[in-house]
Amino acid sequence: MPKRHRLLLAGAVALLLLGSGLPVSRALYAAHDTMVSADPADATPHVVDGKVDAILPMGNRIYVGGSFTQVRNANESRVITRRGLFALDPATNKVDETFVADFDVNPDRTQDRGVKALAAAPGNNELFVGGEFGTLNGAAARKLVKLNAVNGALDPTFDVSVSAAVKDLVVNGSRLFLAGDFTSVGGQARGGLAAVDAGSGALDGAVDIAFTVPRQGNEPRVETIAVTPDGTTLVAGGNFTVVGGQARWQVALVDVVSRPAKVIDWQTDRFDDRDLGQSRCASAFDSHPRDVDVSPDGAYFVMVTTGAYTSRGSLCDIASRWETSARGSGLQPTWVDYSGGDSFTAVAITGAAVYVGGHSRWLNNPKSDGSNQSATPGPGSVTREGIAALDPASGLPLPWNPGRERGEGAWAIASTPDGLWVGSDTDKIGGWTGAGCEGCEFHQKLAFFPLAGGAAAGQPQPIGLPAELLSVGPAGLVKRSFDGAALGAPVALGAGGDGSRVRGAFWLGGLLYEGRDDGRLLRWSYDGTTFGNSEQVDLRGLPASHQTYNAIVVGFPVADVTGMFYDRGRLYYTLAGDRRLYYRYFLSQPNIADVVVGSQVLVASGEGDALDWSRVQGMTAAGGAIFWSEGADLRRVDFADGRPRPGSVST
């Protein structure tokens, strides 16, 4: 027998769907089913100076790279000299003193010199090290080397000359992809991206795509790369605007299976700020992408940026999700989370969460104070100091909130089956609030958050049919069976608050959310028989009307809503007398204080698609369709990829 779900119809009628189930994905690095604990492990080693730029879990060791020169074990005063790279045993949390690989790094932050990237060689017996360095253990070794994973000895059979700094490394099958400032690899021209044989170091002639014409300055650069788990697609971000002769402003996708490799038909204008005038991103940054990661199932990637936030559609100081399979030009992100003016520097996706690090103070903050390059908390913003976990569906901040002394940023985040490692340039993480350090934890430049003790994450999946349709009126809730075509007999439930004041409602994960005529958003728990006490959702200062600041629309006119429904991280709604169907991102959580209403307002329909949503009297979505009440009629339209399909309306 098909499983029954619940839909709700509110306002004159309000439709809600109730369902369950969280997305499950295959591991790319180390996938998790929950968030990690917000309490970092107590005994991880300290990095005394410099900063951590790279973390590589491999075999039974964790390798840490950066610009440091000294490390020490927790609860020990003895300092161990390690220049740019060390290994630790995660079983004991002690530095592995048998592994020695000292590079000519500089812990001075004004000198961009050190180990920037690490990657595991096939077999996990060796590792690749890339960066800006010239010697290893006193002998010449420039930009890229391969080391023994046990003792750090150089593998002399792997000898690849690289003309300038290596910024990122990815091993895919038998190939090592490298990205950076270079113009040649192995004596042959390569502009920012190259591939070599992971065993011999021989240059792969199939990967010869030039990244050229910098956004700013004279030197194009590929800053960050990631490859999908199936090995077909490479995502690149950096200081370039032309890739393989095609316009690609700072972000590009490359088909690395084809021989030769070719630029994929994936193009967006959202990283192009040329036409924004005074709202361009800050000239102090030649490019904006700082890190990218691909989801464990390969379906999407998240790019994080710097650049000084200016709104007007620019993607500076943001985290944004993009679908890997999308094709065409003028593509738009699935979601964007704005810090309001603080940089993001690292990202790692575990399936349960998207972890981002930087020197951010807030998330869900597209408005700031409306002035260029001014970082302030705007309406709807959520405080997150230096590190955060985002909901993969909506991009909104999950409750995970350890707090980190911000510094310049968290530069490396890496997941393992047991948890999450974070590398940075500061010494306090866990309990940090930004207002002081009473009770915060001391972990110099490196911390580990165990998976044990982490809370569940994720939101309910879309609802199928048949379902239960619940209408809200003066007498409370009335339930009917609904298969998408026919309604069953009404059954009065007589609960759910004063239905005459409801303006829109929706079911989500065992909870009934209702928008009221006084502008409040309330919710009740409901187990199918009994309602709990009402709770009020904190709108965090969102205006009671739509307001535009620097081309970003914020505000939530709850009192004017005529219908609502939830679908995959988005809350859709209609307004009285308005022909548009709006949406905003929405995060439901068990604790009412952790519920987040997205600040930014977006339009799904009603602008140029011949659909008119001004007469809605309650709505819901189920089985790939939107259902709404209009007068005496119950109407439907096909709903896919987050938008209704014009031409499919029926009554």
Question: Would you name each region that the model predicts?
Answer:
Residues 2-27:
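Secretory targeting and sorting signals
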Residues 20-466, 473-493, 497, 519-538, ...:
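Extracytoplasmic surface signature
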Residues 302, 466-473, 511-515, 570-574, ...:
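Short beta-strand elements that form the blades of beta-propeller/WD-repeat-like
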Residues 596-606, 650-651:
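Contiguous ligand/interfacial binding patches
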